[in-house]
UniProtKB/Swiss-Prot annotation:
Fe cation 2 binds at E87, E139, E171, H174. This is 3-demethoxyubiquinol 3-hydroxylase. Catalyzes the hydroxylation of 2-nonaprenyl-3-methyl-6-methoxy-1,4-benzoquinol during ubiquinone biosynthesis. The keyword Membrane applies. It is found in: Cell membrane. GO terms for cellular component: plasma membrane. Signal peptide: none annotated. It comes from the Bacteria. It catalyses: a 5-methoxy-2-methyl-3-(all-trans-polyprenyl)benzene-1,4-diol + AH2 + O2 = a 3-demethylubiquinol + A + H2O. Its cofactor is Fe cation.
Length: 208
């Protein structure tokens, strides 16, 4: 159930996600790999793809926080909080890599965060089965996007590829976690709407 304390925590998390540099406990994947020379076109492509991935992590943070605020089972809420902390590392990795590539984060991050937070709240209100099912499907779709990006990233951009590869592993673990806690399958129409919405986000974030 929502209360003032939870709302304050949620607002604080939003400010940290959108304004503060993200922190990571694990070493950044690929940090010891060489920074191979990229052409201007390759560097721009890598930066755009990493910007999309950063937006995905902003959305994941918002989604997890919204779901955790309305989760009915304490064990589920704690699992969501833990997953959100792990996603913070992805924020740090992609943020750092975007800077290294000379790119910029999406100017629409507040919009992405707000929309995803609202979805998380709604999913949580529907009950933990749907809450976790929505989470599992989200992570599966994110994992698919990351697999696509591994195909599109320049082969010699080994640092970006290392980050995306580890993120893909982590997202698969989060999907498995959601199912293990009781997440149910979503109706096909909902999956289709999620995929359509995700497509709009990725195409927009590629540029802005």
């Amino acid at each position: 159930m929502l209360n003032v304390d939870k709302l304050i925590i949620g607002f604080d998390n939003a400010l940290r996600t959108l304004l503060a540099p993200a922190a990571t406990l694990r070493p950044i994947p690929g940090k010891d790999l060489p920074e191979n020379e990229l052409s201007k076109i390759e560097k721009r492509e890598s930066a755009a793809l990493m910007r999309i991935n950063h937006v995905g992590e902003v959305c994941a943070q918002a989604l997890y926080q919204g779901q955790a605020l309305t989760a009915r089972n304490e064990q589920v809420r704690q699992a969501l909080d833990q997953a959100a902390r792990e996603e913070t590392e992805h924020l740090a990795w992609t943020e750092r890599r975007i800077a290294e590539l000379g790119g910029h984060k999406s100017f629409l991050n507040p919009l992405w965060y707000g929309g995803s937070f609202a979805l998380g709240l709604v999913a949580g209100v529907l009950g933990d089965k749907w809450n976790l099912g929505f989470l599992a499907e989200t992570e599966r779709q994110v994992e698919a996007h990351l697999a696509d990006h591994l195909q599109r990233l320049p082969h010699q951009d080994v640092r970006s590829r290392a980050i995306v590869s580890q993120m893909k592993v982590d997202e698969a673990c989060h999907a498995t976690m959601a199912v293990s806690y009781g997440g149910g399958p979503l109706p096909v129409p909902i999956k289709a709407v999620m995929k359509f919405s995700s497509g709009i986000m990725t195409r927009t974030a590629y540029w802005v």
